[in-house]
Amino acid sequence: MEDTLSGEEGEEEEEEEPAPAPAPQDPVEPQLTEASQVLGASEIKQLSLHLPPRVTGHPWSLVFCTSRDGFSLRRLYRQMEGHSGPVLLLLRDQDGQMFGAFSSSAIRLSKGFYGTGETFLFSFSPQLKVFKWTGHNSFFVKGDLDSLMMGSGSGQFGLWLDGDLYHGGSYPCATFNNEVLARREQFCIKELEAWVLS
């Protein structure tokens, strides 16, 4: 009889006190593998609210940064090899302006444009402004050896970076109907980070 009672008690305990589940990660608080040199915690939290639900809760892994890896687009492509997940590009220019882009897939060399409508541009000027896909065209991301381009239309790019990742530009484009992301259409990069979100 004791066996039966203890068995019943054990069953009751399981129903009343299941093993505690790990506390869910706050989807607004991304887990970064290391500190960003471009954005602070407040900006990261604001930006994370605009990321697609499929990447919410995924850790942010710093795959490339100019302070560690140097100013080289080819090096950025090499660091991206083997990664397929979405990428967040964070930039700070010589004027201190912070801006960047979310790419739905890894940054890579390509003959044409690639990506999906999840891709967007953003700027902190000083408040966060996010420029999502308009549906007018599908010119999301294109990478060649001399430049990386995001968004296009009428011969202008929403964001472009040159091969040495030192100079860049931003112009209004049909893909995102964006404003100029930096204070000026042409800028010099002080720091660039590429975070894989997967």
From Swiss-Prot:
Sequence ranges of Acidic residues compositional bias: 1-18
GO biological process: negative regulation of cellular response to oxidative stress
Annotated ranges, domain TLDc: 37-198
Region (Disordered): 1-30
InterPro entries xrefs: TLDc_dom (IPR006571)
Family of this protein: Belongs to the OXR1 family.
The protein, known as: TLD domain-containing protein 2
Native organism: Mus musculus
